[in-house]
Amino acid sequence: MRDTLAIVGGGPAGMMAAIRAAEVLGNGRRVVLFDKNDRLGRKIYLTGKGRCNLTNRRSWEEFAPHIHPNQGFLKHAFRAFSNEDVIRFFEEELGVPTVTQQGQRVYPASLVAGDVARALERRVQELGVDVRRGVTVSSLAELADFGAVIIATGGKSYPVTGSTGDGYRFAEEAGHTVTSVFPSETALLPKDYDPGLPGLEMKNVGLHLYIDRALVESEQGDFNFTNDGLESGIAYRLSRRAVWALYNGQRVDIVLDLKPALTEEQLINRLQRAPQLWFSSRSQKNARGSKNHPLATPVFNRHSEPSDTRHTGLDPASLRSFLPEVLVAPFLRANPDLTVENLPQRLKSWPFRIIDYKGFERAVVTAGGVSLKEIVPKTMASRLRPGLYFCGEVLDLDGDTGGYNLQIAFSTGSLAGISAAKYLL
């Protein structure tokens, strides 16, 4: 078996490695693919909310900032098998047409993740790869008879798919360093989470991440309030740094900007141009006579319900001019001292103290992993043990939401497969 390659893990990186290795060797039987599940690519079925965001079409210069913690490590693998190469591979070799959507995200045209997983598995079988499903590899020692080994076991996210961190143990067995691993692209739970928020979808808003009260990152786009907290979209992009900060005992705050396209001054001007929106009809006459009109009238206080105008003279329904109706009540509860004067600032700055996060059982991605210092970026080979290779999420390499993580899997998997096969020749 010294002329045979073992690949542990049948996810996107492992299948890509198997395909490339079989092509180089010209004999799929010299490639043995082990997977503990009864079907390959199980995690692919969950990606992109079941639609499978294959990659992102941004140029390397725009793509690279979305890779963590060392974008330079990926550069050679990306150049060797780029996002455009991935698209051509699926369309021309696997017969899976693709579509590019908002944010340069690429999906199968069917928007069915299973089409991607099945196409990869079909190609693996066509090449004659020896696929051993339902087989758990417990240690590297079990693979001692193989001439080369690729570890493509994934991380620890979504353990129900078989990603239980086995690859870290294999790496340590070979003398490799494994950096701290933690959940990324996961839900962030605020303190005193308002029960009216779960289920709301936020569109075109801003989120600002503060660690120990210092602004460290900002994003603009969409996210969801769920039962678990702030989730999906731009919340996921902030979660990597937020989780790491919580992991290290730091204070984490996220500030929501409901009107990122407008400055506070522009919001103030809007109010001044249409003061009638902010007072109930019965109080407009008195309000006009106030020397502080129109920017000093409370809109809500601790003793009134959101729909109660008896104390304020202002109809909270007017907030619908600035907020979706379903968000009005939670916004007012979060701002019991709201006035027309401070309304612009509150619309631009709704703070959430983050106290917890969902773990690996819900995280989309694992951050951390096998130290990149011990991997050759041009081959994915171990610097410590000849014939040993790593690819995919098991590495200390991850990306933002938007197709970046699957591109990492495909690029590093392709390079590892080619390199390991050449090692055997």
Identify the residue ranges that each predicted region occupies.
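Glycine-rich loop(s) and the adjacent beta-strand/alpha-helix scaffold that form part
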Residues: A148-D194
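A conserved FAD-binding loop/helix module that cradles the flavin
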Residues: S157-A174, L397-L425
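Conserved N-terminal/central alpha/beta ligand/cofactor-binding core
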Residues: K36-D130, V135
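Beta1/beta-strand and adjacent pyrophosphate-binding region of the FAD-binding site
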Residues: M1-A13
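A conserved short coil-to-beta-strand element within the FAD-binding core of flavoproteins
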Residues: R133-L143
